[in-house]
């Protein structure tokens, strides 16, 4: 027996300290609900749980991003719904104007409403926005830049590659011409390159700069072929330069229409030849005239057919693979048009880098829809307007269908993200959360050990007192 060192008390105290530490940890876990409260509790488990927390937070934010994307799409689709309603109304007006019972005054009134609806379409295009971001003015579509302001790319199809295209207009499309034949003299051609009116039998016929050959022909046909006319035409002289002449004795003039003053010659080249070959769009697209069929040749044995359609200042190139570009051309010019990807709206619909969804909303206005120069002042032009508005309605419907597909995809993405977050949260719970029942068993065990340890420590401290009995004896 020793009195300098109470080994039993030291052992009991040491064990009691360990029991107290275990009891403290158990109390901490029970009060917090977490198995891991610090890195020392489970270093690997802590690292895993933190990565899971990061992923869960990213998935939840991605779900909110997708919901915001749906809001954007619904905003654009709502505006397009109204645009399509206006196009339907304009088509209805065109059908009305095509009826032969209408007078010129009736058609003029109809034209006024069409013009107002066109202006409203342009207003919707420039003002529709979400969170101050314009949606229908082309900023959410692929961007394009032209180094010549006389040639501007208005719209392009999805199959158009992101690269540079060289566009050459060797002859600008000319407006329709009218020819006046004066008895006993030579013929003179009057090129109507401006908005003007022709007075026939005290009745004014309006000819617009954008009127096609058929438009002019129909207006003159309805007025009669041989009429008394007073007109100041622009006459093309021998040197090809325009001259102004006034017809003094204008009775008995035969008023006829001729073909366009000049055919238009268009050439488009993709500067990336390998890309052009891979896409099958050929290295060049060229054509002349109205609705001219052209052949695209890249190499021997490779040939495709495309259509170059010219309507006033607008040139549309389309091939059999729906490679489609629409340009606005002002006179003879050459330009390099660069197509970029900078415009689309990329929605972050995943928790990690690169998990994005591209949303493209094409520019929607009267230029892209082709309704800017529509007129229904004659039966012929009204008939043509019906087709123009039908095509515009189909184009808007196609855009709305694409937006609907975007929305359906985003809704499924939200469901998928929510399920992923749910499953990952469940996995995190298994790693991080404490099993309360099991931990309560541990706590009870440590509590009993603590109480018994205190009792045994008291007993160990009393043992040295037994030495006094030896000294007393």
Q: What are the language-model segments listed below?
A:
Residues 1-473:
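Primary detection of the long, small/polar-rich alpha-helical "axial" segments characteristic
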């Amino acid at each position: 027996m020793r009195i300098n060192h109470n080994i039993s008390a030291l052992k009991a105290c040491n064990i009691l300290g360990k029991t107290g530490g275990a009891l403290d940890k158990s109390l901490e876990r029970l009060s917090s609900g977490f198995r891991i409260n610090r890195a020392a509790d489970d270093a690997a488990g802590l690292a895993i749980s933190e990565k899971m927390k990061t992923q869960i937070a990213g998935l939840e934010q991605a779900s909110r991003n997708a919901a915001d994307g749906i809001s954007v799409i619904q905003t654009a689709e709502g505006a397009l719904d109204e645009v399509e309603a206006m196009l339907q109304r304009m088509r209805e007006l065109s059908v009305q104007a095509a009826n032969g019972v209408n007078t010129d005054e009736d058609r003029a009134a109809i034209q006024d409403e069409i013009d107002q609806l066109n202006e409203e379409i342009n207003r919707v295009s420039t003002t529709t926005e979400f969170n101050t971001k314009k949606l229908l003015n082309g900023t959410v579509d692929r961007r394009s830049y032209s180094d010549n302001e006389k040639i501007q790319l208005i719209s392009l199809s999805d199959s158009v590659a992101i690269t540079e295209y060289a566009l050459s207009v060797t002859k600008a499309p000319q407006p329709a011409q009218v020819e006046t034949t004066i008895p006993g003299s030579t013929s003179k051609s009057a090129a109507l390159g401006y908005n003007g009116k022709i007075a026939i039998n005290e009745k004014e016929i309006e000819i617009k700069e954008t009127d096609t050959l058929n438009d002019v022909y129909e207006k003159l046909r309805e007025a009669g072929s041989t009429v008394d006319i007073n007109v100041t035409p622009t006459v093309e002289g021998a040197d090809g330069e325009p001259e102004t002449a006034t017809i003094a004795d204008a009775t008995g003039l035969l008023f006829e229409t001729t073909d366009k003053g000049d055919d238009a010659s268009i050439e488009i080249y993709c500067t990336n030849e390998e890309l052009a070959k891979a896409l099958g769009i050929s290295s060049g697209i060229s054509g002349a005239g109205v609705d001219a069929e052209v052949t695209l040749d890249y190499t021997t044995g490779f040939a495709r057919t495309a259509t170059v359609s010219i309507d006033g200042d607008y040139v549309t190139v389309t091939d059999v693979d729906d490679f489609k570009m629409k340009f606005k051309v002002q006179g003879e010019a050459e330009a390099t048009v660069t197509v970029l990807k900078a415009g689309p709206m990329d929605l972050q619909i995943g928790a990690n880098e690169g998990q994005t969804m591209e949303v493209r909303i094409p520019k929607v206005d009267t230029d892209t829809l082709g309704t800017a120069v529509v007129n229904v002042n004659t039966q012929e032009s009204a008939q043509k307007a019906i087709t123009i508005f039908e095509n515009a309605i189909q184009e808007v419907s196609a855009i709305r269908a694409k937006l609907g597909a975007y929305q359906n995809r985003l809704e499924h993405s939200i469901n998928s993200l929510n399920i992923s977050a749910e499953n990952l949260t469940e996995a995190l719970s298994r790693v991080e959360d404490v099993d309360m029942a099991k931990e309560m068993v541990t706590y009870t065990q440590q509590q009993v050990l603590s109480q018994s340890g205190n009792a045994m420590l008291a007993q160990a401290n009393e043992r040295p007192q037994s030495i006094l009995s030896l000294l007393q004896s």
